[in-house]
Curated annotation (Swiss-Prot):
Residues binding [4Fe-4S] cluster 2, per UniProt: C159, C163, C166
Assembly and interaction partners: Monomer.
GO CC terms of this entry: cytosol
Its job: Catalyzes the methylthiolation of N6-(dimethylallyl)adenosine (i(6)A), leading to the formation of 2-methylthio-N6-(dimethylallyl)adenosine (ms(2)i(6)A) at position 37 in tRNAs that read codons beginning with uridine.
Keyword tRNA processing appears in the UniProt entry: yes
Residue span, Radical SAM core domain: 145-375
Keyword entries, A-Z: 4Fe-4S, Cytoplasm, Iron, Iron-sulfur, Metal-binding, S-adenosyl-L-methionine, Transferase, tRNA processing
Taxon lineage: Bacteria, Pseudomonadati, Thermodesulfobacteriota, Desulfuromonadia, Geobacterales
Protein's recorded name: tRNA-2-methylthio-N(6)-dimethylallyladenosine synthase
Catalytic activity: N(6)-dimethylallyladenosine(37) in tRNA + (sulfur carrier)-SH + AH2 + 2 S-adenosyl-L-methionine = 2-methylsulfanyl-N(6)-dimethylallyladenosine(37) in tRNA + (sulfur carrier)-H + 5'-deoxyadenosine + L-methionine + A + S-adenosyl-L-homocysteine + 2 H(+)
Length: 446
């Protein structure tokens, strides 16, 4: 074991990147790097990047600039870039940023210790090659366990859908599913370390196992994971609406450990726009899935994604998106102005929507979503909810956790409750959380 040094990882983008950052920390621990939340203390800084939108990509270059002068005042300091921008740019990043030491793509996490050792010797390296599926299967690093009540578990990587606006297949590669036995073993190991809730991760979890002969379907995997003794809750993300199967919907009715929340990105409420996006479903088909999920799990909470200003989007198309939102009543929504990405099919479509109109549509959509989110939060006030207590809140004098429907609840209670299921009465709503009081008498919680 070498002398301890400090690692700071800054994460951009999706939950898959959050999970990858946890794996980065685990891989580098054996190289003598301990995690720190302070970049000024770090001997190695890694930016784990996102390239889904141009704005996210530009932000990376801005953050790299912050570290330009660090080496002159800190001997041995190293700077690295991983994730989707690294996969997309590769060697060009080293050429554009002379003070950058190492670059590693989405298929190269397993090489990170070797790349860091090379950087410590003064060798600048970029490793962004895709690797074959058989090799990838054997190189899925598990997320390390350092306490915590919840944990991400990767079940698959990549995407074969090629939505016309999306760069993910080009930077994450084609779909590949982990062996179900490996996933279940990782869940069992996590529970033995004190984990009570797992979130199953993939770019399109609904495709899990479909291309692997003899493997479980995603619904079958959920049912097997639910059999793990000591596990309280199961979540998953992200789902492609076209691949939501009747078997998966049945899990919401028949598997009590599966939480009553689903992230179901619609992207648009207009059939014309959905067709140009190559989403593979219609508005009516999406709503059929929503209603089937509601029938299976009354009270299920929906979150999603919406894109405004896609090339050719008319005001009528936009109003179709607004009306879809009003039908679904999302608990929360990630919404963005369309951003053309290199290599994607939509990048070649002539953009007919002005920047001013795109911003106007985004503002109107987000105003509506904030109203619906507030209404949803208010509906919880006065109810009793079961909360998986995850830890001490940012305020320090309260605990926090999540209800089945994925809303954060803060409440005053003894820290001995961390890691348990607590019954809480919701007393107040806020924009991004709920406030509650611990229940001392017996009663029915949702």
């Amino acid at each position: 074991m070498t002398e301890n040094k400090y690692l700071y990882v800054e994460t951009f983008g999706c939950q898959m990147n959050v999970n990858d950052s946890e794996k980065i920390a685990t891989l580098l621990k054996d190289e003598g790097y301990l995690p720190t939340d302070d970049p000024e203390r770090a001997d190695l800084v890694i930016l784990n990047t996102c390239s889904v939108r141009a704005k996210a990509e530009q932000k990376v270059y801005g953050h790299l600039g912050r570290f330009k002068g660090v080496r002159s005042r800190k001997k041995g300091f190293l700077l690295g870039v991983g994730g989707c921008v690294a996969q997309q740019e590769g060697e060009r990043l080293l050429q554009k940023v002379p003070w950058l030491d190492l670059v590693f793509g989405t298929h190269n996490l397993h090489l990170l210790p070797e790349i860091v050792r090379a950087a410590e010797r003064g060798e600048r390296r970029a490793e962004v090659g895709f690797i074959d599926n058989e090799t990838r299967l054997d190189l899925f690093p598990e997320t390390g366990g350092e306490g915590g009540v919840t944990r991400f578990v990767t079940v698959m990587q990549g995407c074969d859908n090629f939505c016309s606006y999306c760069i993910v297949p080009y930077v994450r590669g084609r779909e590949i599913s982990r062996r179900s036995s490996d996933i279940i073993d990782e869940v069992r190991k996590s529970v033995a370390e004190g984990v009570k809730e797992v979130t199953l991760l993939g770019q399109n979890v609904n495709s899990y196992g479909l291309k692997t002969e003899g493997e479980l379907s995603f619904a079958g995997l959920i049912r097997r994971i639910a059999e793990v003794e000591g596990l309280e809750r199961i979540r998953f993300t992200t789902s492609h609406p076209k691949d939501i199967s009747p078997e998966l919907i049945a899990c919401f009715a028949e598997v009590p450990k599966l939480c009553g929340h689903i992230h179901l990105p619609a992207q648009s409420g207009s059939d014309a726009v959905l067709a140009r996006m190559n989403r593979g479903y219609t508005r009516a088909g999406y709503l059929e899935k929503v209603e089937a999920l509601r029938a299976a799990r009354p009270g299920i909470q929906f979150t999603g994604d919406m894109i405004v200003g896609f090339p050719g989007e008319t005001e009528e198309d936009f109003q179709a998106t607004i009306s879809l939102m009003e039908e679904v009543r999302y608990a929360d929504l990630f919404s963005f102005i369309y951003s053309p990405r290199p290599e994607t099919a939509a990048a070649g479509i002539r953009d007919t929507v002005s920047r001013k109109e795109k911003q106007s549509r985004l503002d109107r959509l987000q105003t509506l979503q904030q109203q619906m989110k507030r209404e949803r939060n208010i509906s919880f006030v006065g109810t009793r909810q079961l909360v998986l207590v995850e830890g001490v809140s940012k305020r320090g004098d309260q605990l926090y956790g999540r209800i089945d429907g994925n809303r954060i609840v803060n409440f005053a209670a003894d820290q001995s409750l961390i890691g348990t299921m607590a019954e809480v009465t919701i007393t107040q709503d806020y924009q991004n959380s709920l406030l509650g009081e611990i229940v001392t008498d017996k009663g029915d919680a949702r």
